Amino acid sequence: MKVIILLLSSLISLSADQIQGRLKIALLRVSFPEGDYPGFTGSGNFLFDANDLCSNKTIDPGPHDKNFFQSQLVAVNNYFENVSYGAFGIDTTYSTIFPKNNQDSYLIDQRMNYYNELGKENDHEKRITELLKDAVVAAYARDSIDLGSFDLVAVIHPGLGQDFDLPFLDPTPEDIPSTYVDENMVNMYFKDEIRSGNSIINKGIILPESQNIAIMDEALASAINSPCDLQFSVTGTWALMIGFAIGLPPLWELDSGASGVGIFALMDQGSNNLRGIVPSRPNPWTRIYAGWEKPTII
């Protein structure tokens, strides 16, 4: 899985041996002007219709509304509570999905392929940081939300994440990559500019609506042999991005992309285990680092 990850920064009790407590997340659903974007999955808005292409074997079926994302939040909380033995989880009581209407989003006045546009590779880091800024600004402009009371801001965008090495030529290379936007990125491009009321937002994560090629783009699915074999849940992606945000170190080589421990750890390639529905546990080293396990000295 390809993920943009820069230097890690802290969030709540994030020194080694102390990743504990309940993370309160503000999840901002954003959409873009609808249109035909050949390099991007979908039309710019969320999938609100059911798609029965894979019948009762569909992973993360529509509608992708507030209720759907709430269920994903519960799933990720269950995952972290399990792997941390109850030490860490998501505050599912006070974490909030915005806007509050079930099928709604904040419309960003920017074409959606702008944030990962082909031919603009040198601008990708700035533009993905700009997406965090655009989402926060749009949410405050409409609902006057002060996000300073939350531990983490997550932006949910329509379409797939540009996160996989596909076994064929990628037909949608401008999909937005799942990203942890850290404080260094924000300070480099928009220092003190991402404001929500009286609060300055200096980090966040970018999450896709789905990782299921089969249901997200009918034209794309029809051009692929056995599209239902390319289904993945977004649960693993969400768990991985939250892992970065709480300070779990990546376990692959950042410069080359070479895997360190493979599918046996969340913070390497384990986020897509069992098609992303049941991500791999953080490996023993990571659990010790987080304070969720105690090492046995022999």
What are these regions (language model features)?
Residues N67-I215, A219:
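Active-site-proximal segments of metallohydrolase catalytic domains
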Residues K2-I12:
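Sec-dependent N-terminal signal peptides
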Residues S15-N67, K133:
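N-terminal module-boundary/linker segments of secreted carbohydrate-active enzymes
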Residues L152-A154, P158-I298:
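Extracellular hydrolytic enzyme modules, especially secreted metalloproteases
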Residues D17-Q18, D146, S256-A258:
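Short consensus segments that form the blades of beta-propeller domains
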Residues P33, D49, L53-N56, Y79-N82, ...:
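Structured segments of extracytoplasmic/periplasmic soluble domains
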Residues G21-A26, D146-V153, G262-I263:
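Loop/turn elements at helix/coil->beta-strand transitions in domains of secreted/extracellular proteins
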